Amino acid sequence: MKNEMKIKLFSYDHRLLDQSVRKIIKSSQDSGAKVKGPIPLPTKKEIFTICRSPHVNKTSREQFERRTHQRLIILLNTTEKTKEYLKNIIIPSGVDIQITLR
């Protein structure tokens, strides 16, 4: 029976994201799991347009952008040891994690 774990990471800062990915891959390899990835997923880009003036000057606007970077890591042949190793990793607060078990 194969145990497969998919870990999807999200962050606005790609440096924090890559640092977290390295930590997860290192601890997974130490526990004996086979690692596929990191697979970079498409970056989501959101643009917000806001009027600078509260009353007139409709043509005076400012645009803000938010990019969400994503990575996917697939772990094969995971064991309880792998799960314990992953629980002990300290991930920065700017990184969100979504884990799917199969």
Curated annotation (Swiss-Prot):
NCBIfam families: PRK00596.1, rpsJ_bact. Belongs to the universal ribosomal protein uS10 family. The lineage of its organism: Bacteria, Bacillati, Mycoplasmatota, Mycoplasmoidales, Mycoplasmoidaceae. GO terms for cellular component: ribonucleoprotein complex; ribosome. One of its GO terms (molecular function) is tRNA binding. SUPFAM superfamilies: Ribosomal protein S10. Involved in the binding of tRNA to the ribosomes. Part of the 30S ribosomal subunit. Coiled coil: none annotated. Keywords: Ribonucleoprotein, Ribosomal protein. One of its GO terms (biological process) is translation. It comes from Malacoplasma penetrans (strain HF-2) (Mycoplasma penetrans). This is Small ribosomal subunit protein uS10.
